[in-house]
Amino acid sequence: MADFLSLGDLGRWWQIVDALRQRIPTACVLCGERTQGGGLCSFCVADWHYRYKYVRWRCQRCKVAQLGGVCRAQQLCQRCLTQPQAWHALAVAFDYVAPLDSLIWRFKNYHQLRLAPMLARMMQQAMWRDGWAHPTAMVVTAIPSRRQALRRRGFNPAMELARYLARYLGLPLASDLLALAQPKADQAQKHRTQSQRWAHAQHAFIWRGAPPPETLLLVDDVLTTGSTLHSAACCALNHGVKQVYAVTLARVPWTIL
């Protein structure tokens, strides 16, 4: 099929497949209520959008949410004001809090790969929510997994999301543009403090793609401080990419950081 269909045709074909799948009666993957398509029921969809929209405050650059306390007047958090990230724009599907965080846990740690199409669709809707109009010359890639995590899981969660997202958007997917600079000595970012994350991420990636695409869409599953995406974006820009967009499934809010 890929031999005689353009990327745009493939994107439309996947939209048809997804539309047909939406008619199949299933249980909501979050609450168990009856729905269709193997995704969220209408109540959970509404709750998802409500939870993202009605937070106390959200940085317009890195999308970090403040779930309590005093509402801020400025649009950017202090880190974004003093240390701007390298990406052009960022879209986030939801905050990494209950109950939606359970979907990521099941997807990553219980090998529920059947959730990938729905999660990628949520990422696409996040891009629409932010008013993105992605360039036709954009190429999709994912943040690579550490070797230890790849051996443990058997798959890269970010790449699984990127595969479906690229299909939905009708964009090309490149799986080998970025690599970890120190895969053997690398330590999971989740075990580092914020300052350690940013220090470690300065030279965390090497560029393997040639020639570079004009515009790149970076895909990751969970954004904590933004150091990993920032480092990957810097690597891409330093090797000739003109603009870097980023989309993540979840963003850790300040109450958890």
What name fits each language-model region?
Residues M1-L257:
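Glycine-rich phosphate/pyrophosphate-handling loop used in enzymes and phosphotransfer proteins
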